[in-house]
Structures are given as structure tokens and as C-alpha cells.
Curated annotation (Swiss-Prot):
Its EC number is 2.1.1.-. The gene is okaF. The keyword S-adenosyl-L-methionine applies. GO terms for biological process: methylation; secondary metabolite biosynthetic process. Pathway: Alkaloid biosynthesis. This is O-methyltransferase okaF. InterPro entries: COMT-like, O_MeTrfase_dom, SAM-dependent_MTases_sf, WH-like_DNA-bd_sf, WH_DNA-bd_sf.
Length: 382
């Protein structure tokens, strides 16, 4: 078995991202085939507990403590204040799920997963998963059972309202609970840095757009760009290309930028359903925006951008383009949650063509760039 494991590790280390994804998938299928029916049921039962143990480890500082050094059970009891008999069971459970590792009879230490769970953004990410995503997922069965027509057509009539006992839409509710915005941004910050700017020939697209030395044009308008991470990636990719880079966001999000605004990036308060003040920019960039809404709302926002585009402008949509079958689990989960929480959706290639056509746009090219079907879609007005 050790020789087999070493061979798999060697293959995993020496292949590209697509190859690693296939290895991971094939191994998951193989391992699942070994489970008995009862083991499959037990794993379902363990799912909620696994998340709860992660939350406990974050809240009680267990992962941080072990990431600094190994601890004995008495040391962790003193550090956390949790009752000895309960903490010992929690630690054993965390070790059984691979969150930490056991050392000797009563000792515990960090592993790779512990280090991740002790990371700077993980606390907010885990809290967001536990406080927001978990209740939404739990409310889906009841939502479907109670409705004769379970179609979700409005942001005010989704699983979110049932999960949080509110009549407000998801983002309206979040505005009244700003701590969750901060947790959301920490969650999103953990995504792998597969850079959209490396996915297509971006300098060829810019061409001679910025050649006029007397005019500083706008290179990028990052619509709904959060705290500017993608604009920073754009600047790093093209430090030698002059031109303004502007992030547009709602006020509730800009609060989280504050004095930490990245150098060379402008921030502007903006609602994407109001007239676009930046006209004739080279790129109007939307990342994880269209999947928040159903088609009608997307068309409305896209038409606003079209009115601001010049003859050299390009619309860039950075989102998943999912296949009609064999969808990766990551994209499938995200699609379900977007629909359940916000009446949004991840879209197939056909759905993207139909959506952009309805808005008055045509797709010039699509560049996939990761295993979750994340893609750069380049479009222009018809």
C-alpha cells in the first residue's frame, strides 16, 4: 500500500491542475466504492458534526494553539476552559476527522489542515459557513415541501427568507448584519489565486488604447469589485501599462476597504442599476456578479454598461460556464446555494449566449481557466 500511495503522490505532484483534479476525483470514487451502506449513512450523520467541530476549534482557539506548538490535554483544558471530559471528546473527534493529530496518550499537534484552520481568514470563513450557508442548506427541504410551486423567481421569495425568518432579500438582510459582510469577504479571500488576467491575451486586447500620452484613459472598471483583489491582480499583471483602474461598489462594502485601499486603485461608490458614470473604458469587468441574479435583473444591469461602452470597449464576465452534465461538485454546490439564497444561478454555455443576446451583446470568446469551470467571457454590443 505504501508503494501505491507513493506512486499516486508522484503522479499528483508531476501533473497539471486538470490532472490533479482527475486524480482527486478518481480516488474519491474509488474510496466511496469501499464503503458499506451503513458507513455511507454514518458519513451523512457525521456531516453536521464535522462542521460543528471546526467551529468549536476556531472559537476556542484550539487550532491557533496547536499551530503554535504541540499541547497536552491539560494544557488545552487550561487554555480553553472547556470541561475536561467534554474537551477530550472534542479533540478526539477533531483528530478522527483529520483536523488535528494525536501525539502519545494525551497529546495533540497540528497538521496541514490545522494550519489552514488557524489561518488569518479562516475564522471569518468558518463563521460565514456556519451562520449563513448552514441554515440555508438546512432550510431547502422544508422550503420545497411546503410549496406547491417551488420555482424561485424573486430575491424576496427564496430559501433565505425561511432560513432567517425575514421578508428581506439576502443582501438587504446582510446590510443590517454587517459582521456577516466581513465574514463573507474572509471566506472569498480563501479562494485559489487562479488569475483571470492570465487566462487570455490581455495586452493584445488593450492594443493601442492607451497610446495617447495626453489622455489618461480608464483601463478597467471593476463593477461590484469588492475590496479590489481582482483590480490588484490586473495592476500586477500590467504594471507598465498606464491608465486608471476603478473599483465600483456599494457603500456597505466600501466600509471594509477604508484606509487599506491598494495603491494605484480608485474606489467609487456605485449601484450598478444606475447610469454608469465611467464612459468609454477599455474593460468593464464583472466577477461573480451575474450569478447573483436571474436573467431579467442581469439584462437590466448589462444594458446600463452597454450605454457607457465605446467602440474599443470590451465587457469581461468572470464566472463559471458549467457543462450540461458531469458538473464538478464545487460548481454544483455553488449553483444550488446561489439559487436558494438569492434566486441567482450558475449558467451553462447556452444560457450565457441566451442571456447576453437578450441584453444586446454577443460573445467574442470564452477562456476557461480552472477546474470549477471559471471562465473569462469577452463580449461586445451587437
Amino acid at each position: 500500500m505504501e508503494a501505491i500511495a507513493q506512486e499516486i503522490q508522484k503522479l499528483h505532484a508531476n501533473t497539471d491542475e486538470a490532472g490533479r483534479g482527475k486524480i482527486n476525483h478518481d480516488l474519491s470514487v474509488l474510496l466511496a466504492s469501499f464503503d458499506t451502506d451503513w458507513e455511507k449513512i454514518l458519513k451523512l450523520a457525521a456531516g453536521p458534526l464535522r462542521l460543528a467541530l471546526v467551529k468549536v476549534g476556531v472559537d476556542q482557539g484550539i487550532f491557533h494553539a496547536l499551530n503554535e506548538r504541540s499541547h497536552t490535554l491539560p494544557e488545552l483544558i487550561e487554555k480553553t476552559g472547556v470541561a475536561p471530559y467534554l474537551l477530550e471528546r472534542i479533540l478526539r473527534g477533531q483528530a478522527s476527522f483529520g483536523m488535528i493529530k494525536e501525539e502519545g496518550a494525551k497529546g495533540f499537534a497540528a497538521n496541514r489542515f490545522t494550519t489552514l484552520l488557524a489561518g488569518p481568514n479562516t475564522s471569518g470563513a468558518v463563521t460565514y459557513i456556519f451562520d449563513i450557508l448552514r441554515p440555508i442548506a438546512s432550510a431547502i427541504p422544508g422550503f420545497l415541501s411546503e410549496r406547491n410551486n417551488p420555482a424561485i423567481t424573486s430575491t424576496h421569495d427564496t430559501v433565505f427568507q425561511r432560513a432567517f425568518n425575514t421578508e428581506l432579500g439576502g443582501f438587504e438582510w446582510m446590510t443590517g448584519h454587517p459582521e456577516h459582510y466581513g465574514n463573507l469577504f474572509q471566506f472569498l479571500a480563501l479562494r485559489p489565486n487562479c488569475e483571470w488576467v492570465d487566462a487570455f491575451p490581455i495586452e493584445a486586447e488593450i492594443g493601442s488604447f492607451t497610446n495617447d500620452p495626453h489622455v489618461e484613459k480608464v483601463l478597467l472598471v471593476d463593477v461590484g469589485g469588492g475590496t479590489g483583489a481582482q483590480s490588484v491582480a490586473f495592476r500586477k499583471k500590467l504594471p507598465h501599462v498606464k491608465g486608471r483602474v476603478i473599483v465600483q461598489e456599494i457603500a456597505e462594502t466600501l466600509i471594509h476597504v477604508g484606509a487599506k485601499a491598494p495603491a494605484g486603485i480608485e474606489f467609487m461608490e456605485y449601484d450598478c442599476f444606475t447610469p454608469q458614470p465611467i464612459r468609454g473604458a477599455k474593460f468593464y469587468y464583472l466577477r461573480y456578479v451575474m450569478h447573483l441574479w436571474q436573467d431579467e435583473r442581469c439584462v437590466e444591469a448589462l444594458k446600463v454598461i452597454i450605454t457607457a461602452m465605446g467602440p474599443e470597449s470590451r465587457l469581461i464576465i468572470d464566472e463559471a460556464v458549467i457543462p450540461d452534465r458531469d458538473v464538478p461538485w464545487q460548481a454544483a454546490c455553488q449553483s444550488i446555494l446561489m439559487t436558494a439564497a438569492l434566486a441567482g444561478a450558475e449558467r451553462t454555455l447556452t444560457e450565457w449566449h441566451n442571456l447576453l443576446d437578450a441584453a444586446g451583446l454577443k460573445i467574442l470568446n470564452i477562456f476557461p481557466y480552472d477546474l470549477n469551470m471559471q471562465s473569462v467571457i469577452i463580449a461586445v454590443p451587437k
